[in-house]
Design a protein with these regions (language model features):
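Short amphipathic alpha-helix that is part of the acyltransferase structural core
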Residues: 4-54, 153-191
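Flexible, substrate/cofactor-facing loop regions flanked by secondary structure
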Residues: 158-233
């Protein structure tokens, strides 16, 4: 496979766009191929905390894969050098410092009708949305999120929890926790929208050893998912402490212990939290996380 993810996706997303910059210089936006992998990873490695999800997809599946749930595009200047990289698909992610590339990616996203969300740094997404809204789009829901990073783990009093990677026997509990968290965040139930696909993706992540849990008597007390991993950065999501066990310090100790484990194989760990959940910020700071920036996630109307 070298030029497309699936027939369904390539029917609605063009493989190449060409446009003129305000300066008169040309830009081209083209679907990236597996042979572009080294160049793309080098570009993304310049800002690893902001590109870990895209880089993680590529390291896991390659540039071209149905498991990326979208198509990677590169925006190049007249000199052929990358000015930006975007994953256009279920979740649209963008990395660029070039405003003309943002405009080009907005035009590209306009031609893809099935995106669920667009996520990125606040200022970049605001500029992107300025171009995208002019094409007739309105958000279904917008969330402001705070980016945190952990590079070292503080000493925390209390027993060290016996964290382990989840097993397939934990699958149903993990699915329920993740589905409930997604409904709370964006209002869409993944078990209704794509139940089989959602279950398959969670099961695959468990098989990869990327779901960490602490359990007692068969009940998951703590859970966290490693969504993406590179040598420079790990991105966590789906962090959850069982409702009956909150406020006892279990979550802080589990998250700190998970940091000790993961920082042995990556330089940093990052995560996002909804800015409305202020108490979570204190929770992450106790576990050694520091604030790094502001993100926007814009949920789109399904078409």
């Amino acid at each position: 496979m070298s030029s497309a993810v699936s027939a369904a996706e390539t029917e609605v997303v063009p493989q190449m766009l060409s446009l003129e910059r305000a300066s008169g210089q040309s830009l081209s936006v083209k679907a990236l191929l597996n042979e572009d992998q080294a160049e793309v990873l080098a570009f993304l490695s310049l800002r690893p905390i902001h590109t870990v999800c895209m880089a993680g997809y590529i390291l896991d599946h390659g540039v071209v894969s149905a498991q990326n749930r979208g198509i990677f595009y590169g925006c190049r200047g007249a000199d052929g050098k990358l000015k930006g990289v975007a994953l256009v698909g279920h979740a649209t992610l963008i990395e660029t410092q070039c405003d003309d590339a943002l405009k080009a990616f907005a035009q590209l996203e306009h031609q893809y009708s099935r995106s669920h969300l667009i996520r990125g740094e606040h200022e970049m997404i605001q500029r992107f949305w300025g171009y995208y809204a002019k094409l007739g789009h309105q958000p279904r829901r917008a969330c402001r999120e705070l980016l945190f990073e952990q590079q070292a783990v503080p000493e925390i009093k209390g027993d060290i929890p016996a964290l382990r990677t989840a097993m397939q026997a934990d699958l149903d509990q993990v699915i329920k926790i993740n589905a409930d968290m997604i409904v709370s965040e964006c209002g869409v139930d993944p078990l209704v929208k794509d139940g089989d696909g959602f279950r398959e993706r969670v099961a695959r992540r468990i098989d990869q050893g990327r779901v960490w849990v602490w359990s007692e008597s068969g009940r998951l007390i703590f859970k966290a998912d490693v969504f993406a991993e590179t040598p420079e950065m790990i991105y966590l999501e789906g962090i959850n402490v069982h409702g009956t066990q909150r406020g006892n310090g279990y979550g802080t100790r589990c998250l700190a212990q998970l940091g000790r484990i993961l920082l042995q194989r990556s330089r940093s760990i990052c995560l996002l939290m909804n800015e409305r959940k202020e108490l979570l910020g204190d929770f992450y700071k106790k576990a050694g996380y520091e604030f790094r920036g502001v993100y926007d996630t814009i949920y789109l109307h399904p078409q």
